[in-house]
From Swiss-Prot:
Protein name per its UniProtKB record: L-fucose isomerase
Keyword list, A-Z: Carbohydrate metabolism, Cytoplasm, Fucose metabolism, Isomerase, Manganese, Metal-binding
Catalytic activity: L-fucose = L-fuculose
Active site, per annotation: 337 (proton acceptor), 361 (proton acceptor)
Reported cofactor(s): Mn(2+)
Gene: fucI
GO molecular function: arabinose isomerase activity; L-fucose isomerase activity; manganese ion binding
Assembly and oligomerization: Homohexamer.
Organism: Escherichia coli O139:H28 (strain E24377A / ETEC)
UniProt-annotated binding residues for Mn(2+): 337, 361, 528
Length: 591
């Protein structure tokens, strides 16, 4: 099949159309703004897959309806998914704006004195507001000279934030969520809401029974040579942890090998179901070779699969990581227990950063007093107000061990295009594979076990659906915390020591849900959350506003909150504005 092209960023230079001196004097400056914007975006951004971002500039400056239509025709033919309109001068507001109702759009009005770029910006935004097509405002804080072609830091920040979020919107549109299985143990996020995916994300849901996975394994609908490669890779790289099962439930070497083989096969088959695999056509399985065009997936597993077959922990952990037997590659997004709403938070984080995402239970709040009582240790530093134990049954991306290093040598999780094979190997070396606990997983399996290094900035997110309101997003920026080994061991053994752990300390504001760490835990809307590397809550807020998903909880500084200009007309409290604007405009792809 022809590979679907990636969305591009459209740049729209708009200009005062009056000839006989006005337009002519502005052509070069206006087009240079467009070129500078395109140069910035192509230099600083990449798609989540690692490919370079492409910008498409209008063939001419846009002064009115005819040139706007010509620009739109070009953009439509080149898969432009978001637009940035730029101008240093007055132009004709509603005659020059981008009118596509679902395409994210921003306007940069040059802050200069010679020509009123700010006046056009205000006029165009008024037209957008009146027509119900929200747009983002970009206006530099300081006046620039007319011949200054530099992009100020504050303008650059907004251009990049808008573009990152807009690319995420455009990249999700038209894709699918592969729901492999149904509802897992009554978890609400696995009651997959087709209307949410269609109306807010522009996606479809592909519902597939888990028997399809069984069929592919049993009928050998996979690349057998790749399976041998995967087994050899696991033999070389997997370290195995202790088997905590009672002796009657422990498997012998032959049985353990069969469990490992099936776990790796599950990873291969789920991947093939998501994105297709041309190798399957070579063995006569043309239909299966196409895949389901899935940008994210979820696997029910418990309990209808896991009571008989190996659990999804190994498959999910490998798919969610930035590497496997084929080397370093783009991580997939696969939600444990088919928690589609956590899967959407994972998808957002991956699209914004290009990094792997850590799926976890928001398991336990440990107060400083409780930790001191149980271990004798007094918390300090980032952990002084208490910590949250983020832990799940082994499906978290192995990148979450944070054995990768940034340019200053600090532990981190990198975009996959920056990860070396040495760093991938270090993440594998930091991971143990522990036999699944029989009482939970009767069909066996292996859970990955690692401990996230401390002092790493993270953003924890979660999407929830509220009846009568729709989807909402929660955001909590904070850091991973490193505890003394003996303290970690005592706390970890009180739950399940065969699973991966991140000790998380959210940044507190002293207000509302961020009054203290207990309040963060108490206000979290579900049993799962996602960790995305870095303090990127502002990017999530911008993305959510594009999709019309209100943010019900965040600890991002107010100066970093960036939403469409029309939000300001919905009241004076910025969080109340968000709710009213999202309700007023409705989901991006209204259905």
């Amino acid at each position: 099949m022809k590979k679907i092209s990636l969305p591009k960023i459209g740049i729209r230079p708009v200009i005062d159309g009056r000839r006989m001196g006005v337009r002519e004097s502005l052509e070069e400056q206006t087009m240079n703004m467009a070129k500078a914007t395109a140069a910035l975006l192509t230099e600083k951004l990449r798609h989540a897959c690692g490919a370079a971002v492409e910008c498409v500039i209008s063939d001419t400056c846009i002064a009115g309806m005819a040139e706007a239509a010509a620009c739109e025709e070009k953009f439509s033919s080149q898969n432009v998914g978001l637009t940035i309109t730029v101008t240093p001068c007055w132009c004709y507001g509603s005659e020059t704006i981008d009118m596509d109702p679902t395409r994210p759009k921003a306007i940069w009005g040059f802050n200069g004195t010679e020509r009123p770029g700010a006046v056009y910006l205000a006029a165009a935004l008024a037209a957008h507001s009146q027509k119900g097509i929200p747009a983002f405002s970009i206006y530099g804080h300081d006046v620039q000279d007319a011949d200054d072609t530099s992009i100020p830091a504050d303008v650059e920040e907004k251009l990049l934030r808008f573009a990152r979020a807009g690319l995420a919107v455009a990249s999700m549109k038209g894709k699918s969520y592969l729901s492999l299985g149904g509802v897992s143990m009554g978890i609400a996020g696995s009651i997959v809401d087709h209307n949410f995916f269609e109306s807010w994300l522009g996606m479809k849901v592909q519902a597939v029974d888990m028997t399809e996975l069984r069929r592919r394994i049993d009928q050998k609908i996979y690349d057998e040579a790749e399976l041998e490669m995967a087994l050899a890779w696991a033999d070389k790289n997997f370290r195995y942890g202790e088997d905590e099962n009672n002796k009657q439930y422990q498997r012998n070497a032959e049985q353990s090998r069969a469990v490992l083989r099936e776990s790796l096969l599950m990873a291969m088959c789920i991947r093939d179901m998501m994105q297709g695999n041309s190798k399957l056509a070579d063995i006569g399985r043309v239909e299966e070779s196409l895949g389901y065009n899935a940008i994210a997936a979820g696997f029910q597993g418990q309990r209808h699969w896991t009571d008989q077959y190996p659990n999804g922990d190994t498959a999910e952990a490998i798919l969610n990581s930035s590497f496997d037997w084929n080397g370093v590659r783009e991580p997939f997004v696969v939600a444990t227990e088919n928690d589609s709403l956590n899967g959407v938070a994972m998808l957002m984080g991956h699209q914004l950063t290009g990094t792997a995402q850590v799926f976890a239970d928001v398991r336990t709040y440990w107060s400083p007093e409780a930790i001191e009582r149980v271990t004798g240790h007094k918390l300090d530093g980032l952990a002084e107000h208490g910590i949250i134990h983020l832990i799940n049954s082994g499906s978290a991306a192995l990148d979450g061990s944070c054995k990768q290093r940034d340019s200053e040598g600090n532990p981190t999780m990198k975009p996959h295009w920056e990860i070396s094979q040495k760093e991938a190997d270090a993440c594998l070396a930091a991971t143990e594979w522990c036999p699944a606990i029989h009482e939970y997983f009767r069909g066996g399996g292996y859970s990955s076990r690692f401990l996230t290094e401390g002092g790493v900035p993270f953003t924890m997110t979660r999407v929830n659906i509220i009846k009568g309101l729709g989807p909402v997003l929660q955001i909590a920026e904070g850091w991973s915390v490193e505890l003394p080994k003996d303290v970690h061991d005592i706390l970890n053994k009180r739950t399940n020591s065969t699973w991966p752990t991140t000790w998380f300390a959210p940044r507190l504001t002293g207000k509302g849900p961020f009054t203290d760490v207990y309040s963060v835990m108490a206000n979290w809307g579900a049993n799962h959350g996602v960790l995305t590397i870095g303090h990127v809550g502002a990017d999530f807020i911008t993305l959510a506003s594009m999709l019309r998903i209100p943010v019900c909880m965040h600890n991002v500084e107010e100066t970093k909150v960036y939403r469409p200009s029309a939000w300001a007309a919905h009241g004076m409290d910025i969080e109340g504005q968000d709710y009213r604007a999202c309700q007023n405009y409705g989901p991006l792809y209204k259905r």
